[in-house]
């Protein structure tokens, strides 16, 4: 079957197809106003913010050994308090769209607001794809003053994976190709653009760019393979 470019106007965030197949994206990005943040979620996000501040402090600290030892003991105590007698999530709970939407929105390693190690990435659905902004500190340094290439690959996988939902199908990454064009600076607003390119059977192709100001830092192509959402949720719960 020949590749056919998908019309974003028929498969955009407002389409019934996308809403039926990808309720996760509805919950996370498309209609956040329909998903009020609960007091428990606010508390978890505040705690995650506090841990992020701690991580940033540890990354740059020159505190003496005894102070670090006391900090370690206190963190161990807090960890025990936090993890004692926590109920396990059942397989049936994991297999629901509601659970997975909450997991991605709150705990995703890329956009999870309650995940203290989530990357500083903010995505927005636009016509035909995704626009995103990220700003990385020295925590993510690879070459001196520059973002590590592994994080560049990771954020491309995230934004291209979101853009492929405009095909009207749920796809998983089959191949990700990164072209590193120039060093990507730290402590700078980075602008990512991801667009759906074509659909051929189960194959969904997307392309993206990463800029720091006017400078092109990287480009990417992603091949995604569409998967039945029910089968995917079944796999997650197994």
Can you say where each PLM-predicted feature lies in the sequence?
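Active-site helix/loop of acyl-thioester processing domains in fatty-acid/polyketide metabolism
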Residues: 127-129, 147-170
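HotDog/MaoC-like acyl-thioester-processing domains
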Residues: 2-93, 184-186, 197-238
């Amino acid at each position: 079957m020949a590749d056919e470019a998908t019309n974003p106007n028929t498969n955009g965030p407002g389409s019934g197809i996308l809403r039926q197949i990808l309720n996760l994206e509805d919950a996370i990005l498309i209609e956040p106003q329909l998903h009020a943040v609960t007091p428990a979620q606010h508390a978890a996000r505040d705690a995650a913010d506090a841990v992020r501040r701690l991580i940033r402090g540890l990354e740059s600290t020159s505190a003496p050994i005894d102070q670090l030892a006391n900090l370690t003991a206190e963190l161990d105590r807090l960890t025990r308090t936090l993890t004692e007698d926590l109920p396990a999530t059942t397989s049936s709970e994991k297999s629901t769209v509601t659970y997975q939407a909450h997991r991605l929105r709150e705990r995703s390693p890329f956009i999870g607001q309650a995940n203290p190690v989530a990357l500083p990435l903010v995505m927005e659905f636009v016509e035909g794809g995704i626009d995103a902004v990220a700003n990385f500190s020295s925590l993510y340094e690879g070459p001196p003053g520059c973002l590590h290439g592994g994080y560049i690959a990771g954020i491309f996988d995230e934004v291209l994976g979101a853009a492929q939902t405009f095909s009207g199908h749920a796809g998983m990454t089959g191949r990700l190709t990164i072209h590193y064009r120039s060093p990507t600076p730290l402590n700078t607003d980075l602008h990512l653009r991801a667009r759906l390119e074509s659909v051929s059977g189960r194959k969904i192709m997307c392309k993206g760019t990463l800029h720091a100001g006017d400078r092109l830092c990287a480009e990417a192509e992603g091949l995604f393979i569409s998967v039945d959402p029910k089968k995917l949720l079944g796999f997650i719960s197994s």
